[in-house]
Amino acid sequence: MDAGQLETILRNTPVNRVEKVEVMYSAPPEYHVRGAAINMILKHSNDYSFQGEISANYKNQYFNDGGMNGNFRLSTPKMAFDVMYGANNVKKMEYIDLDSKHTLKGELHNIIQNEQLRSKYWKHDLRVAFEYNFNNKNNINIAYTGSYTPDQYNNSRTSGNYQTSNVDKYIDNQMRNITLQYHSGFGLDIGGDYTYYTSNNAQRLYADYQDGSQSSFSMVGGQKIDRYSIYADQKQSLSKGWNLGYGISYRFAKDLDFQTYDKVTGNIQTQNTYSNLREQTDRKAHV
């Protein structure tokens, strides 16, 4: 998961449920992660319990925005069920003032510009996890993580002595991930996950320049990613406190990306793009 999703989980996880957090600048091979990683280990409950939390936040900066987050956990000696959900209503606005002086062919050009940026959207984060303990050493767990930002609207308005322009952008993002893991009592770990990501956007631009010329275009684009990964790791204890670990992993990904322009007027260089990539990575064994 990315940094934003990890932050959401950390904000919705009670402190008393965290056993430890490992920060690794170079993750070992059995984590199947390239580069840095953060591993959060939660405590296992050995009794019957139910706990939950609800929190809310509010902010006013040009607009009223805020959100609500909640989580609950039901556990028994054999199983545990977790649900985390957060909904945030995001409204942003900022101003950028530009006063720039450029010299071109010995002539000084003074450019004054004011830009207003606005964003408005709802962001939803969901995580559902289930863990079942066959005994003290064997367990299986499955987790679903989702992040949704439907109907995001961004607007940029620019005015000044060089141009007056308006850009409207509409975005719809979705990410879903499901993970399955099995931990055995004899050191064998088997797991896999599937990630689905899609992003669709539509954009309209109109610009009116100081010299009387105009330009405009409409654009639609999108990206769709399907990624599958599986792994198997084995750990063995040796004499004198040594451990031996080895395993294998495989990952396959499909990435579809496109961008198409329409209703282009004025002196604007546009290029339609399309790509459909398939990639197999991390097919390797490690010791």
Could you say what each language-model-derived stretch is?
Residues 43-62, 81-83, 188:
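Transmembrane beta-strand segments of Gram-negative outer membrane beta-barrel proteins
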Residues 55-69, 109-125, 163-175, 217-227, ...:
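Outer-membrane beta-barrel proteins
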Residues 125-149, 168-287:
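Face-selective signature of the C-terminal outer-membrane beta-barrel domain
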Residues 2-26:
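Short acidic/polar hinge/loop motifs at secondary-structure boundaries
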Residues 45-53, 100-112, 154-165, 204-216, ...:
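Flexible, solvent-exposed coil segments and beta strand-coil junctions
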Residues 7-9, 22-23, 33-55, 68:
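N-terminal periplasmic accessory domains that precede
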Residues 1-2, 39:
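Extracytoplasmic beta-strand/coil segments of soluble accessory domains associated
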Residues 63-91, 107-151, 174-185:
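Transmembrane beta-barrel wall of Gram-negative outer-membrane proteins
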